[in-house]
Amino acid sequence: MNSSLGILWQACPGGARILRVFGDSPCPALPVQIEGFPVVEIGPYCFAQNQRSQPADARFWSVDGRGPAAYPHPIAGDFVQGVTLPAGVRALHNAAFYNCRKLEWLCAGSALESVGSDLFTNCRALDRFILDAAPDAPTGLKKLVAAVSADIGAVFAPGGAVQAKVFYPEYFEFLDENTPAHIFNHSIEGEGYRYRQCFDGSVLRFAEYDAAFPQACVGESEKTLCRIALDRLCIPYALLPEAQGIYSAYLAAHAASAAAPLIARRDTESLQLVLKLA
């Protein structure tokens, strides 16, 4: 938790709901509890630049005990780059990160159960969710990736130790009108939707995720497929031999495409894996 952080909050069923965050850090780590109440919810438009009026029962609290005058700057909008939620957060309300265009990552625990609508609208820089949970634990990942149709990665890192990585490609949804009958046909383009269904309840099913790769090879780009294969091979959590062979064969056949982004970001560990397969 940041040592200099101001919080506008209200009581809610089970604990505290954070309504607004103030401070100077673009990557705040929110408090586990406020005045003895466990933090369990993030309120609507909490990190949005333009916020709605606050409820009458809203209260101010700060880590260092100073009042609201010491915290004039909201951590909101384009200022936000990453947010670490307390492990006990169960709900993210509507548009909590609305128009946070520079938000790159969100870290959440295993308690997340509910997410609102328009949660990440216009969060164009968002590229990963970090789960402070074991890869085989129930988490809110299914709901989080369902809220983002663009490319998005997920990292399981309980206690900060990375145990698994997966990548969810972009997908698109369309409604096509059959004009004479006034019937709308729902269609989906991209394998990202299929990947987002690979859960048993709220637990990621790695075998099902890996089984989607051959179909993804039909329509996804080399860049996307290399990312999927690399994430699974570099940290092969619950990776079955058959899937490992398929991923390895793909990277061996597309080594140049796989290596290019790794060289650009100087990811030597992943690059060595690709070179061994080539």
Question: What are these model-derived regions, one by one?
Answer:
Residues 45, 51:
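Glycine-rich, acidic and aromatic/proline-enriched surface loops and short helix-turn segments
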Residues 274-277:
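Conserved hydrophobic site in ankyrin repeats
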Residues 2-15, 22-40, 52-91, 101-114, ...:
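Structural signature of tandem-repeat unit edges
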